[in-house]
Curated annotation (Swiss-Prot):
The gene is SH3GL1. It comes from Gallus gallus. Its main location: cytoplasm. This is Endophilin-A2. GO terms for molecular function: lipid binding. It is found in: Cytoplasm; Early endosome membrane; Cell projection, Podosome. Residues 268-289 have a biased composition (Polar residues). Interacts with ARC. Interacts with SYNJ1 and DNM1.
Length: 367
């Protein structure tokens, strides 16, 4: 730095100290200038804040944003043209739905519905990617350019103006001790910088319709995204409702328990002093009151075992009309399965309903 430059820096520093510490009065700028400066400062803060919040709106996960920034930097270093995109939450949800939909298989209503929903979520992610690109091109990039160019240039002019004001005020305070020509030059430079700064701020504020246009582009992009999203979700909702209608119109598949294996070991003499093996009967609430009586198997109306029948495991006392009563050990002819809990059968010429869990199926009903 030249001697003249060092002297100028000393003048400005000295004037700044006298104003901050000594309370010296500096040259006042007019109210119109200060009002423009205030509006420009607010514009700068607004643009910076809106840019930050827009990026957070499009890419809400900070960890994913940081990772994406790192990957984009690495791609530039490696000279890769295509950069990885932001992992949209709709896409991640869709991948999860599709994975489990495939695992559940086509036999599952839920699995098929998950596949439908997963494909729709992936379509939503693609639409969201398009929104990101559209907003970046027509909103984020223009505002970023405003920050990097116009606002930065205004800040440069204001900083230069402040420096020349300090230089001018220092020399004005020492009027008579410095040449008049030097004071005149300092005043002219100050006035020149003020005019340049004033012009640049005026141009920015008068052309703020450009920012309105950019904001309109943001809203248009959002509208387009939401229209497509509504269309995708409407189609998905209709698919799911159609699946529900189809499922409700199909006959319900009744659960058919496999018949239990029965063992009938007759008494036989063993050459080695063997024993007879008979299964221990299950004890029911009703049979517990008859525990002093010997176990017996009913011989009433025993049907041929070539027709559907079952064996009573417990006593059943009918409580309602249409129910069929029986005793433990009775053999009951099966005529129909009402639902997953009740059979219809006959014994001793009487027919009625009885609970499935009171009997053991010997010969199941035909499918």
């Amino acid at each position: 730095m030249s001697v003249a430059g060092l002297k100028k820096q000393f003048y400005k520093a000295s004037q700044l100290v006298s104003e901050k510490v000594g309370g010296a009065e500096g040259t006042k700028l007019d109210d119109d200038f200060k009002e423009m400066e205030k509006k420009v400062d607010l514009t700068s803060k607004a643009v910076t804040e809106v840019l930050t919040r827009t990026i957070e709106y499009l890419q809400p996960n900070p960890a994913s944003r940081a990772k994406l920034t790192m990957l984009n930097t690495m791609s530039k270093i490696r000279g890769q043209v295509k950069n990885p995109g932001y992992p949209q939450s709709e896409g991640l949800l869709g991948e999860s739905m599709i994975r489990y939909g495939k695992e559940l298989g086509e036999d599952s209503n839920f699995g098929d519905a998950l596949l439908d929903a997963g494909e729709s979520m992936k379509r939503l992610a693609e639409v969201k990617d398009s929104l990101d690109i559209e907003v970046k091109q027509n909103f984020i990039d223009p505002l970023q350019n405003l920050c990097d160019k116009d606002l930065k240039e205004i800040q440069h002019h204001l900083k230069k103006l402040e420096g020349r004001r300090l230089d001018f005020d220092y020399k004005k305070k020492r009027q008579g001790k410095i040449p008049d020509e030097e004071l005149r030059q300092a005043m002219e430079k100050f006035e020149e910088s003020k005019e340049v700064a004033e012009t640049s701020m005026h141009n920015l504020l008068e052309t703020d319709i450009e920012q309105v246009s950019q904001l309109s582009a943001l809203v248009d992009a959002q509208l387009d995204y939401h229209r497509q999203a509504v269309q995708i979700l409407d189609e998905l909702a209709e698919k799911l409702k159609r699946r529900m209608r189809e499922a409700s119109s199909r006959p319900r598949r009744e659960y058919k328990p496999k018949p239990r294996e029965t063992y009938d070991f007759g008494e036989s003499d063993q050459s080695n002093g063997g024993f007879s093996c008979t299964p221990t009967p299950k004890v029911s609430a009703s049979s517990s009151f008859r525990s002093d009586k010997p176990f017996r198997t009913s011989v009433r109306s025993i049907p041929h075992l070539d027709q559907p029948c079952c064996k009573a495991l417990y006593d059943f006392e009918p409580e309602n009309d249409g129910e069929l009563g029986f005793k433990e050990g009775d053999i009951i002819t099966l005529t129909n399965q009402i639902d997953e809990n009740w059979y219809e059968g006959m014994i001793n010429g009487q027919s009625g309903f009885f609970p499935l869990n009171y009997v053991e199926v010997l010969v199941p009903l035909p499918q």
